[in-house]
Design a protein with these regions (language model features):
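Short, functionally important secondary-structure microenvironments
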Residues: 1-169
Length: 169
């Protein structure tokens, strides 16, 4: 809702750093993300994107959901980069979170395998949300290299993406 972060009560010592990293990340969304833009995202997406989706057999809701997921990925990288630069004491928690969700053996296996190589939304989304993983395969899907270059993780990591609106555009 853009106002609070809820953490589950079932935390053991092994999961604590991951949970703290996730809570810090989600809390940073509250401080840094533009929730007005996110609430109005459906109307911010150019109509031609919906038309293109329809031509490819993708309904309006799926277009919206996909754009929202990609925006969230870019926004996550922007926020995490900001926190890394401004709050270095939190890095270990973020590293724990990244190890669990992005750099796990299962993610690496999926990226290196023949899976998620069909030109459909799920394959693209798996590959996109793991573009910052060293095992990304930019030739796994048509256009993935261009998507990677458009997102420009290096620019984000240098702190050159200022806000949610810039992440969207």
């Amino acid at each position: 809702d853009g106002k609070k972060v809820v953490i589950g009560a079932n935390l053991d010592d092994k999961k604590f750093d991951v949970a703290v990293g996730l809570a810090l990340h989600e809390g940073s969304h509250i401080k840094l993300s533009d929730f007005t833009l996110l609430r109005n995202l459906e109307n911010s997406i150019p109509q031609e994107i919906y038309v293109l989706g329809e031509k490819m057999g993708v309904d309006r809701y799926t277009v919206l959901s996909t754009v929202k997921s990609i925006l969230n990925y870019v926004e996550d990288r922007r926020i995490d980069s900001f926190i890394f630069k401004t709050s270095p004491g939190y890095k270990s928690y973020y590293h724990s979170m990244y190890e669990k969700y992005f750099y796990s053996k299962n993610v690496d296996k999926g990226l290196l395998s023949d899976e998620f190589r069909t030109e459909e939304i799920d394959s693209y989304m798996f590959r996109i949300i793991n573009l910052h993983n060293k095992n990304r395969q930019l030739t796994a899907l048509k256009g993935l290299k261009e998507i990677y270059e458009t997102i420009d993780l290096g620019r984000i990591q240098r702190g050159l993406m200022r806000d949610t609106n810039e992440a969207f555009n």
